[in-house]
């Protein structure tokens, strides 16, 4: 399964805080841990691009600062989300072990706030170094030995996290037949609840070789299985919501790190699962951005 960072227990957190003289009364992590959980609320992040050096600037952006601001926003929500998904490109460039140590360190406040974090891989990640750096935190057993895949069951939907990393620093992605077979079998075994598929890479086309190479094979699996309601991805560093002709929602998450085109928003999405759909609330890091607070209401296909 993808690296799963469980919440840090309240006891662990209090002990760590006391040892570090953290000032419990003012701690946003403790404040978040004391809140009720929104069982249907989820934080959707992509492309955090963290580097070992917290002062590193890329495209005019400090990536560590951006994730820190998102983390603080999550901790200050009226109700804490049930969990956080980070849909690939966790590392800055080539997925070094020290990058993933920084990732683990930066995600600790979220875990202290009692929110589990699910991490998937993108083309700027390195699977082996990822596993090595986070060895103590990951689940002991994965459904596929050499891929980061998971099924996360929740009250109103099942989340399927896939691994589209083909080669580090190679832009396109690939799922491969073994992973597609696992997805098909897992969907068939879980027919009676909406399914949401999370993959780092965007749907690819002949004209767009930078996306998912086996997009058509993926759609051959998910289109006829009517419980699949959405395909959620990052990679393009663009915020966009579209719909496949079959009715599957295509949700392109904004980057937490930097944008490729001036004017695009950086930030995250607060997703709220409803009985027959999902509400998406865009949270821009630049709160003056015209898209900040944009709400998209999705209705599930029948």
What are the language-model segments listed below?
Residues 190-206:
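Short acidic, glycine-rich surface-loop motifs adjacent to enzyme active sites
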Residues 45-46, 84-88, 117-122, 162, ...:
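Active-site neighborhood of phospho(di)ester-bond hydrolases with catalytic His/Asp-centered motifs
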Residues 34, 96-184, 189, 194, ...:
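Extended active-site neighborhood of metal-dependent phosphoesterases/phosphodiesterases
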Residues 1-7, 12-32:
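N-terminal export signals
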Residues 18, 53, 95-96, 128-129, ...:
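Short N-terminal helix/helix-N-cap motif within the alpha/beta-hydrolase-1
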Residues 32-100, 192:
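N-terminal active-site segment of His-dependent metallophosphoesterases
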